[in-house]
Each structure stands twice: as structure tokens, then as C-alpha cells.
Amino acid sequence: MRYLITGATGGLGGHILEYFIAQIPFSDFAASSSSPENRSRFESRGVNFRHLDYENPTTLNRALHDVENLLFISTNANVIDVEKVKRQHRNVVEAARKANVKHVWYTSLPFGGLTNDSEVSVQRAHLATEKMLKESGLTFTCIREGIYVEGFPLFLNWYPETTLLTLPRDGEIAFTSRVELAVCTARLMIQGGFENRIVLLTAGETITAKELVSVINETTGRRVELRYVSPDEFVDAGPRNDRGGKSRAFFETLVSLWESAASGELRTMDGLMAEILGRDPIPPRDAVRQLLVENRDHTWHQMYAKK
């Protein structure tokens, strides 16, 4: 099997799968999911399916048999549980090594750009995985994917009903279209190369929280106000006032994300994405405006705590 796409029921993985369906013979790739119940969803479209669960080494060993290129989508485990992420990723790397996978394409995060200096907990988990890959002897490419522009409500903790937003800090973020990231990731895999390298895919412009609020107001006619509060006040008030029922740990994580943005960790941009697309990526301001024109109440699934 030339290509195995993990996370095929998710956002990024799903878009990558659609690119493969449109561009590659069906016999050359397979989709995988942690839920065997998804088999019919793919096979009804003629797509090969393999059950693969990051928590279950048996499924990993079986699914990775004869795979040449593995798209290793980082786990969707709660980003607050860094140790769980590391454990699951270690399972994948070990199984890929045992299966002699020829090339692992890993989706990482862009905190710190192309450096390894970020102290943000979610990025430390990715850095640990990148280190595992380097030490495994596998051929790999770590793709640091830009922050999804579609998820901007999560960074602001903005709901359609919100009239007053509070944040602990502000900073520039190179928010990037998830659809464009998927296209570029798929093209990287298909064209090959970039062996044992870390690459960065981002939009060519940045945007701040203050500017995001302006776009919300300009596009939807709302009058959302943004105030800056201390990190302690933000964390204390967040769980009490949150419509989505998110935990205190979420707001602690959000503080660290905005502190990293304020220090410049998310403003690094790279020209590789434009090179792969053959044009400039959609700027974050335009992307947010487009999302809100399509749905003035645009939201993001992680805004609501899982029950």
C-alpha cells in the first residue's frame, strides 16, 4: 500500500483523503480510523479501510503492514493531556518502525516556527514526537501545520452570542486555511522528498485578536468588545462564564497559547505553502471574513466540552 491516511474522519485527514480520491488510483491508498464502525463509510465509496487505534498496538501492527507512506495525523486526544499524546504517538512510531514504513509524514504544530524553543505544552508534545521520529531510524517529514483559521472562535473563546470578549494577551498569528493545508500536505506526500526534515506551512500574513474582533464586527454587524485582563482573572472567570462548559485547564492552556503569540511564536511565516499551491495562501483576514459570510454564527467543535 503506497499511502495510509490516519485521522481520515477528522478535518485535516478528511480533506487530505478527498484530495487523494480525486488524484490517486484507489488501489494506492487506504483510509484508517480508530472506529471499525467507519469501515462502511469508506468502502461504500470504494476506498480501502484499515482499523487503526493509537491506543492499541495490535491494530497498529496490522494496519501498517506493507505501508510505504504513512500520514501520521497527531492524536485528537485532549490537548491538555500531554502525557497521553506522547504515549499514543510513541505507539505509532514504534509500530511504524516494526513495519518498516518507508516514510512517515507527521502533522505537527507551528509554535516557535522552525525552532525547537517553544515552551507551550501542546508544542512540547509535538517536539517530543519529532524527537521520537529522529531517533527511530525511520525516514520522516515533520509538517508544522499553521493554526487553523477555521478555529479562530476557540482562540478568542467567541460564541455567536458573545458581546464582551476577555483575553489575557494578544499577538500576531499566521492563521491558515485547513483546506489549503490539506492540499499542501497531500501534494508533499505525493511528490515525495523532504526526507528527515521539518517544514512549515503557513499563510503569508498574520492577524491579532483585536483585528479578528474587528473583522467579526465589520462582517456580521455585531458590536463585540474586547478587553484585556490578567491571566489569573481570565482563568478564574473562564469556567464560570463559559457557555461551552470547558474546564479551568482549558483556560490555563489558552493563557499559554496567547502568551506564546504575544512573544512572537506564531507570527513566523514560510513561503513553502505558496510554492506548493502555486499562489499566495488566503490571508487570515479574508479567510475569517469568508467564513462569517457563509455563516455569521461560525463556530468550532472544540468550543464545547465533551460530555
UniProtKB/Swiss-Prot annotation:
Q: Which domain of life is it from?
A: Eukaryota
Which InterPro entries did the record assign?
A: NAD(P)-bd_dom_sf, NmrA-like, NmrA-type_oxidoreductase
Enzyme nomenclature, EC number: 1.-.-.-
Specify the pathway: Secondary metabolite biosynthesis; terpenoid biosynthesis
Q: Name one GO molecular function term.
A: oxidoreductase activity
Residues involved in NADP(+) binding: 4-9, 32-36, 53-54, 74-76, 148-151
Q: Which family does it belong to?
A: Belongs to the NmrA-type oxidoreductase family.
Q: What does this protein do?
A: NmrA-like family domain-containing oxidoreductase; part of the gene cluster that mediates the biosynthesis of flavunoidine, an alkaloidal terpenoid with a tetracyclic cage-like core connected to dimethylcadaverine via a C-N bond and acylated with 5,5-dimethyl-L-pipecolate. The tetracyclic core is synthesized by the terpene cyclase flvE and the cytochrome P450 monooxygenase flvD.
What this protein is called in its record is NmrA-like family domain-containing oxidoreductase flvB
Q: Give the originating organism.
A: Aspergillus flavus (strain ATCC 200026 / FGSC A1120 / IAM 13836 / NRRL 3357 / JCM 12722 / SRRC 167)
Q: Which gene encodes it?
A: flvB
